[in-house]
């Protein structure tokens, strides 16, 4: 009996000591700063285009993210896109963001990894904050969403390294000037550089008053891709490095729940189909006004893209809509668009309804 009591006592003491040790186990400090978040965008669209009627529910985006800081000076983020299929890289679940940024100095920050290209005001915006049923056509076609070069859908992202910063503070502590410039593979997300030639993308904007910024952006580079061209002997296909030279002019005013933004983007360089020529451009202008501040908004957007920089190749959306925030992280959006496609001599109506949530 004494032996049994002794064994039981020793076992209890061992368990108590083990529990005490566990209480003193400390996680690395950077783990305490890790934030888990995500969002989803459920979309319904219907259009009455002649001989191509559509109406469908879809998951526009579903994403999960981890982000945090290491030693205060370093910020990092990993973001996954979950919606899609497993049949192709373009549409399968995939990594969209994976980067770290050294942020010790406000006027000089260094970012490396996979992230949004520093081109235009709209491209880096969160898709819910951006305000409409999709990014504008010129941003989609000329910043790497459904790019005219045939680049895989990359949501405006690439792999590379960039520097950026803000400086020239006024008396209130607000910076007057922002700059950013980076070097990238030029192939979009999750891709190596296929021609060993890098893209250089940069931008700068001034902020002369609170809420207002006016900027300009430039982009030069190449993409190694398959092209087709119609010749006297018939269609010719080959793989080659195709030049991309692009610029954007941008202006935005965002203050007290009001937003007005306009951008013009120009591109020189052949599309995947060379018959479309080597020039394209597009522009958009939008306004978002509060009906109930931080609760309900009405909005309008004029969105035009010319695939060959001619009016005959233009596609234009005339959009109006509204959104209502059911809570801070849940909102409903309704939009109507009249669409004019000059290339196909067609005009039609489009209705979009979305439920967006964050956590």
Which role fits each region the language model picked out?
Residues 23-186, 194-200, 205-214, 286-290, ...:
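Outer membrane beta-barrel
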Residues 182-191, 226-233:
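Active-site-proximal beta-alpha loop/turn segments in soluble metabolic enzymes
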Residues 42, 117, 190, 219, ...:
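Short, electropositive, low-hydrophobicity segments enriched in small/polar residues
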Residues 12-13, 82, 121, 273:
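Alpha-helical transmembrane segments and their juxtamembrane interfaces
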Residues 5, 18-27:
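Basic/polar N-terminal segments that are highly enriched at the extreme N-terminus
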Residues 48-52, 71, 88, 99-103, ...:
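Outer-membrane beta-barrel pore domains
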Residues 10-18:
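Hydrophobic h-region of N-terminal signal peptides that target proteins for export
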Residues 2-8:
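Sec-dependent signal peptide recognition
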């Amino acid at each position: 009996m004494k032996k049994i009591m002794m064994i039981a006592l020793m076992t209890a003491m061992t368990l108590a000591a083990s529990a005490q040790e566990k209480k003193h186990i400390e996680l690395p400090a950077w783990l305490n700063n890790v934030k888990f978040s995500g969002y989803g965008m459920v979309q319904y669209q219907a259009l009455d285009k002649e001989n191509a009627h559509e109406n469908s529910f879809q998951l526009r985006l579903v994403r999960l993210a981890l982000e945090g800081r290491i030693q205060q000076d370093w910020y990092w983020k990993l973001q996954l896109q979950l919606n899609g299929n497993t049949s192709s890289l373009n549409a399968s679940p995939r990594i969209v963001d994976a980067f770290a940024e050294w942020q010790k100095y406000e006027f000089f920050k260094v970012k490396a990894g996979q992230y949004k290209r520093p081109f235009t005001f709209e491209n880096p915006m969160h898709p819910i904050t951006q305000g409409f049923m999709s990014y504008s056509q010129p941003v989609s076609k000329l910043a790497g969403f459904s790019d005219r070069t045939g680049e895989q859908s990359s949501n405006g992202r690439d792999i590379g390294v960039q520097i950026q910063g803000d400086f020239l503070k006024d008396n209130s502590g607000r910076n007057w000037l922002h700059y950013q410039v980076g070097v990238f593979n030029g192939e979009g997300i999750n891709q190596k550089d296929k021609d060993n030639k890098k893209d250089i993308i940069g931008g700068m904007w001034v902020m002369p008053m609170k809420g207002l910024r006016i900027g300009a952006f430039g982009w030069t580079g190449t993409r190694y891709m398959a092209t087709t061209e119609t010749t006297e002997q018939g269609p010719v296909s080959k793989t080659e490095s195709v030049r991309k030279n692009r610029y954007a002019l941008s202006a935005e005013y965002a203050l007290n729940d009001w937003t007005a933004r306009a951008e013009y983007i120009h591109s020189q360089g052949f599309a995947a189909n060379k018959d479309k020529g080597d020039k394209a451009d597009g522009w958009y202008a939008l306004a978002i006004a509060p009906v109930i501040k931080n609760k309900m908004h009405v909005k309008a957007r004029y969105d035009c893209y010319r695939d060959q920089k001619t009016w005959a190749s233009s596609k234009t959306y005339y959009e109006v809509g509204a959104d209502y925030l059911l809570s801070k992280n849940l909102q409903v959006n309704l939009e109507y668009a009249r669409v004019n496609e000059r290339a196909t001599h067609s005009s039609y109506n489009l209705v979009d309804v979305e439920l967006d949530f964050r956590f």
